[in-house]
């Protein structure tokens, strides 16, 4: 039996599972493409920094991990996405060591969702009020 050295690995917090789990070049069957696996925490790191525009420190806090671990996840994600785009590979999104973050109305306090979620609990309630 192998034992892991160092501190125990903690679950990474992600906001939501993606709507799609595969991206591929158009016109080429999946079985003819090489693929790159992008974990859900790698996708979340890209979303928080490159899409939402959070700093690395804020994004690491959002995911419940250290900045060093966050940076390693983000670096890995960017390398995989770059490889897929440059070399025409399929991106398969899935797996990882994560937990879905629980967003609550008290945390948002009427402000835009700090996690950049369109389907946040608060936003769902606003839509129902209309």
Swiss-Prot record:
The name under which this protein is listed is: UPF0251 protein Mevan_1492
Lineage of producing organism: Archaea, Methanobacteriati, Methanobacteriota, Methanomada group, Methanococci
Entry's InterPro entries? UPF0251
Tell me what organism the protein belongs to: Methanococcus vannielii (strain ATCC 35089 / DSM 1224 / JCM 13029 / OCM 148 / SB)
Q: Taxonomically, which superkingdom?
A: Archaea
Q: Which family does it belong to?
A: Belongs to the UPF0251 family.
Q: Disulfide bonds, which pairs?
A: none
